[in-house]
């Protein structure tokens, strides 16, 4: 029944975005692995007004269009697909992510598929990758591919990124590596990787942790055997179908002259069950704001996680106030997802502290 409900939810989301739905390809090559591709939209599925357009484009291609544009995919794997949504990734939320999770989980639980690929916009790709890495319970690989140029652009990067994602998902070398991101010949961890540049093709990096591997001359190569990152934890959300069951966690950004009442608004008016602070430096907050934060914590007892607004670095436990939690190496957007999963799982404050301490290596 859950499989049927998940399929119906996926179809509803896809229909609301005008996307074609589901296709099972009947002609199979028994010598090749089978991969299921999940389309969500993004630049990889976008069209511009001219071949030189690299901004101001709009989503207009389906996942089937993307597959048909790369005929050589048929040499790598048998392909089926599901169009989960067809929007820019800045419009994605748990209404889309939950059916995506269930679709991937069900595909990987089946003997029919060796792995899964997600086509996705790059704006929030790291959030989806992090979410899936913590929730998909399978040794089979999930590979997320996107593009920095629309499909109509001269030298569009999407087709090769999709080809490489299918190749990675179909490779036995990828077993046990969780969710991965692939763009621009790089294979990166879904747990660590972040979009570092708004425009560059070579934008997805984990500068401190490094890449997992690379794609060269039609070969998938990894630098080291499969290993889980420090702080990785599995969260069982197999019974989750209603997005409203995910607790609200709000990110607040540090700046000079910060209004300290923003956190009060987030909790009292918006119903936040947790707060992530994108602090300056190693997660610092204003003196006045810190006083308000502590008062709010004492009144409501909600977790407050200190992360950083810088592109990289760490917020160790000692850099957060005694009542708060340091995000370790996680940026604010990933800290938010981790905190939401902790809260959904019913973790108390000590358990949440322990989870985030693990990300720091503690």
From Swiss-Prot:
GO terms for molecular function: asparaginase activity. PROSITE patterns: ASN_GLN_ASE_1, ASN_GLN_ASE_2, ASN_GLN_ASE_3. It is an enzyme of class 3 (hydrolase). Coiled coil: none annotated. Glycans are attached at residues 29, 93, 239. Residues 33-359 form the Asparaginase/glutaminase domain. Disulfide bonds: none annotated. GO terms for cellular component: cell wall-bounded periplasmic space; endoplasmic reticulum; extracellular region; nuclear envelope; periplasmic space. SMART domains: Asparaginase. One of its GO terms (biological process) is cellular response to nitrogen starvation. It is found in: Secreted; Periplasm. Its main location: secreted. Induction: Subject to nitrogen catabolite repression (NCR). Not found in cells grown on rich nitrogen sources like ammonia, glutamine or glutamate, but is found in cells that have been subjected to nitrogen starvation or have been grown on a poor nitrogen source such as proline. It catalyses: L-asparagine + H2O = L-aspartate + NH4(+). InterPro entries: AsnASE_II, Asp/glu_Ase-like_sf, Asparaginase/glutaminase-like, Asparaginase/glutaminase_AS1, Asparaginase/glutaminase_AS2, Asparaginase_C, L-asparaginase_C, L-asparaginase_N. Its EC number is 3.5.1.1. Yeast contains 2 L-asparaginase isoenzymes: cytoplasmic L-asparaginase I, and cell wall L-asparaginase II. There are 4 copies for L-asparaginase 2 in yeast. The 4 identical copies ASP3-1, ASP3-2, ASP3-3 and ASP3-4 are arranged in tandem repeats located near a ribosomal DNA cluster. PANTHER family: 60 KDA LYSOPHOSPHOLIPASE, L-ASPARAGINASE. Belongs to the asparaginase 1 family. This is L-asparaginase 2-1.
């Amino acid at each position: 029944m859950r499989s049927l409900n998940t399929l119906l939810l996926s179809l509803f989301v896809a229909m609301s975005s005008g996307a074609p739905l589901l296709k099972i390809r009947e002609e199979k090559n028994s010598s090749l692995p089978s991969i299921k591709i999940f389309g969500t939209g993004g630049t990889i599925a976008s069209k511009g007004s001219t071949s030189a357009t690299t901004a101001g484009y709009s989503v207009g291609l389906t996942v089937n269009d993307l597959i048909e544009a790369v005929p050589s995919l048929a040499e790598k794997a048998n392909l089926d697909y599901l169009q989960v949504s067809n929007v820019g990734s800045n419009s994605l939320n748990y209404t889309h992510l939950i059916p995506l999770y269930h679709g991937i989980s069900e595909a990987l639980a089946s003997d029919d598929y060796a792995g899964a690929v997600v086509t996705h916009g790059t704006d929030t790709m790291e959030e989806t990758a992090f979410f899936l890495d913590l929730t998909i319970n399978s040794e089979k690989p999930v590979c997320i591919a996107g593009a920095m140029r629309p499909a109509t652009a001269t030298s569009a990067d999407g087709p090769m990124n999709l080809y490489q994602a299918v190749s990675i998902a179909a490779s036995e070398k990828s077993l046990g590596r969780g969710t991965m991101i692939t763009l621009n010949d790089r294979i990166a961890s879904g747990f660590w990787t972040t979009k570092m540049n708004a425009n560059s093709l070579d934008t997805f990096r984990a500068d401190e942790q490094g890449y997992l591997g690379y794609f060269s001359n039609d070969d998938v190569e990894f630098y080291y055997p499969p290993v889980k990152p420090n702080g990785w934890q599995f969260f069982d959300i197999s019974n989750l179908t209603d997005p409203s069951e995910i607790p609200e966690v709000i990110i607040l950004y540090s700046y000079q002259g910060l209004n300290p009442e923003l956190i009060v608004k987030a909790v009292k008016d918006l119903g936040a069950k947790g707060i992530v602070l994108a602090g300056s430096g190693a997660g610092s907050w204003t003196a006045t704001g810190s006083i308000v934060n502590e008062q709010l914590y004492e009144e409501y007892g909600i977790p407050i996680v200190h992360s950083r607004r810088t592109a990289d670095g760490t917020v160790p436990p000692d850099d957060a106030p005694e009542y708060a939690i340091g995000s370790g190496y996680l940026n604010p957007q990933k800290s938010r997802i981790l905190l939401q999963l902790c809260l959904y799982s019913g973790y108390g404050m000590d358990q949440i502290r322990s989870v985030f301490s693990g990300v720091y290596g503690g």
